[in-house]
């Protein structure tokens, strides 16, 4: 063929191929339209009835990957709307020993990973899961900003949560609210989180509900407004929370606030015989909330607040038992005090907890009487009311050769069963002030839950070697 014929042949071939491609595309488009408009598919875009909204969404969009998250969101919204407020209808399960529940090894992993500096940790559950919580310092353990994180209050702290038994990292942590003191709890429908921030003489609390700010509370004594540092508890939507504002080494003003959906229903000043209240650890059962607190002013015995969330009233006293559970503390006396602080804490203390259930009562405390080291659980029947009650059983959680710290109670109120399983956590503090070869202060967490079996014990230390950080 001559050149002109070659050009004509090539052009004709291209036209034929292009025409075939267009026809294939038209056929493909027609098939797709036909498949999506077949009679068995409900393709209406109108708002589905509320009673079957999630099912309609799944039928319409189950095979569209880019819509999957929207479908899940709609399902979650409907489930949340249909959930009921949690009611504290059960009693505590019999406690014969404690089994391991969670451990995050945060400091060990933080030696070579982006783990956040935290303190004041706790555990809290909702109908779907339980998560670790803590106050972050806005830096990682290996970050240069970790220098000075021994200080409790700064603009860089936030309440974060992360999956159970994972370390808190910059990738898996969720910020709940901003502040240097906190509490958080779920009422069965949504979570309420409270964070306190600001200068010592002008701090304020912001109450979040369902991830939105709802209410604010201003300082009333202008001396470090503060709250529980562990989970609150809700009954039929009413969530009592204990706040203190005032001196840590003298008289302070404590209030119990009653919230519903983040809004204040009522507040009342502390009543009863407790003289000083800080950092309460609360649990709920049989339509009441019991909080074991810290008397930082005078008491080596712990004050207890018993709250009726239905009547929205409370009373307070001290644990009567001579088994003292604060730190520092003197040696256990022969007779305890029910309505007065037992002296010997030297204007100091540590957050702690107890489960006060008659003959099923267990108290937690550091093993050391002088420093935050070791941890043990002691069964002390009738400790709340008997001023001569003594331990009948015990379990070591952390040996006295290892550091401990704050501790607190929590329960999974949505777990199956005829009773509530008691649980607790222990903060394992590392770094300053005791380990001053490093510049930071942080912690890991170990948590345990009760068992009706008589289980063996083991040491559950933080486990990080400080020399690896030098």
Swiss-Prot record:
Alphabetical keyword list: Calcium, Disulfide bond, Glycoprotein, Glycosidase, Host cell membrane, Host membrane, Hydrolase, Membrane, Metal-binding, Signal-anchor, Transmembrane, Transmembrane helix, Virion
Superkingdom of the source species: Viruses
Binding site for Ca(2+): 295, 299, 326, 348
EC number(s) per entry: 3.2.1.18
Main location: virion
Catalytic-site annotation from UniProt: 152, 406
InterPro entries in UniProt: Glyco_hydro_34, Sialidase_Influenza_A/B, Sialidase_sf
Residues covered by region (Head of neuraminidase): 92-470
Disulfide bond entries: 93-419, 125-130, 185-232, 234-239, 280-293, 282-291, 320-338, 423-449
Catalytic activity: Hydrolysis of alpha-(2->3)-, alpha-(2->6)-, alpha-(2->8)- glycosidic linkages of terminal sialic acid residues in oligosaccharides, glycoproteins, glycolipids, colominic acid and synthetic substrates
Intravirion side: 1-6
Stretches the record annotates as Hypervariable stalk region: 36-89
Cellular component GO terms held in the UniProt record: host cell plasma membrane; membrane; virion membrane
Posttranslational modification: N-glycosylated.
SUPFAM superfamilies assigned to the protein according to its UniProt record, in alphabetical order: Sialidases (SSF50939)
Location of region: Involved in apical transport and lipid raft association: 11-33
Keyword hit for Transmembrane helix: yes
Glycosylation, residue list: 42, 52, 63, 66, 87, 147, 202
Compartments reported by the entry: Virion membrane; Host apical cell membrane
Cofactor(s) needed: Ca(2+)
Note: The influenza A genome consist of 8 RNA segments. Genetic variation of hemagglutinin and/or neuraminidase genes results in the emergence of new influenza strains. The mechanism of variation can be the result of point mutations or the result of genetic reassortment between segments of two different strains.
Function text: Catalyzes the removal of terminal sialic acid residues from viral and cellular glycoconjugates. Cleaves off the terminal sialic acids on the glycosylated HA during virus budding to facilitate virus release. Additionally helps virus spread through the circulation by further removing sialic acids from the cell surface. These cleavages prevent self-aggregation and ensure the efficient spread of the progeny virus from cell to cell. Otherwise, infection would be limited to one round of replication.
Family per record: Belongs to the glycosyl hydrolase 34 family.
Subunit: Homotetramer.
The protein, known as: Neuraminidase
Organism: Influenza A virus (strain A/Ruddy Turnstone/New Jersey/60/1985 H4N9)
């Amino acid at each position: 063929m001559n050149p002109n014929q070659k050009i004509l042949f090539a052009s004709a071939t291209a036209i034929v191929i292009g025409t075939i491609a267009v026809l294939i595309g038209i056929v493909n488009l027609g098939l797709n339209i036909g498949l999506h408009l077949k009679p068995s598919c409900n393709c209406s875009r109108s708002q589905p009835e509320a009673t079957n909204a999630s099912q309609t969404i799944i039928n319409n969009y189950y095979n569209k990957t880019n819509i999957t998250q929207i479908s899940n969101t709609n399902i979650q919204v409907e489930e949340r709307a249909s959930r009921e407020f949690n009611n504290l209808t059960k009693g505590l399960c019999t406690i014969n020993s404690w089994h391991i529940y969670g451990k995050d090894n945060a400091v060990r992993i933080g030696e070579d990973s982006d783990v956040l500096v935290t303190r004041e940790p706790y555990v809290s559950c909702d109908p779907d899961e339980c998560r670790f919580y803590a106050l972050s310092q806005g830096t990682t353990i290996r970050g240069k900003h970790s220098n000075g994180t021994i200080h409790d209050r700064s603009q860089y702290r936030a309440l974060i949560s992360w999956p159970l038994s994972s370390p808190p990292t910059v990738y898996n942590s969720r910020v709940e609210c901003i502040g240097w003191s906190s509490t958080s709890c779920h009422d069965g429908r949504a979570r309420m989180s409270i964070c306190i921030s600001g200068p010592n003489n002008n701090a304020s609390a912001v109450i979040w509900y369902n991830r939105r700010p709802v209410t604010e509370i201003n300082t009333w004594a202008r001396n470090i407004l503060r709250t529980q540092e562990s989970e609150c508890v809700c009954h039929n939507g009413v969530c009592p929370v204990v706040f203190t504002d005032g001196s840590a080494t003298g008289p302070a003003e404590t209030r119990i606030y009653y919230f519903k959906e983040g809004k204040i229903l009522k507040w009342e000043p502390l009543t009863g015989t407790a003289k000083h209240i800080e950092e309460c650890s609360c649990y709920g059962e049989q339509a009441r909330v019991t909080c074991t607190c810290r008397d930082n002013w005078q008491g080596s015995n712990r004050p207890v607040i018993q709250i009726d969330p239905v009547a929205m009233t409370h009373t307070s006293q001290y644990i009567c038992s001579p088994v003292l559970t604060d730190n520092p503390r003197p040696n256990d006396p022969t007779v305890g005090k029910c309505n007065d602080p037992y002296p010997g804490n030297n204007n100091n203390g540590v957050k702690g907890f107890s489960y006060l259930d008659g003959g099923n009562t267990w108290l937690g405390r550091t093993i050391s009487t002088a420093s935050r080291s070791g941890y043990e659980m002691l069964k002390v029947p009738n400790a709340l009311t008997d001023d001569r009650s003594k331990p009948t059983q015990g379990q070591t959680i952390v040996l006295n050769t290892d550091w401990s710290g704050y501790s607190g109670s929590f329960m999974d109120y949505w777990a199956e069963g005829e009773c509530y399983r008691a649980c607790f956590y222990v903060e394992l503090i590392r770094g300053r002030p005791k380990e001053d070869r490093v510049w930071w202060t942080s912690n890991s967490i170990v948590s345990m839950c009760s068992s009706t079996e008589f289980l063996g014990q083991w040491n559950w230390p933080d486990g990080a070697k400080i020399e690896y950080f030098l």
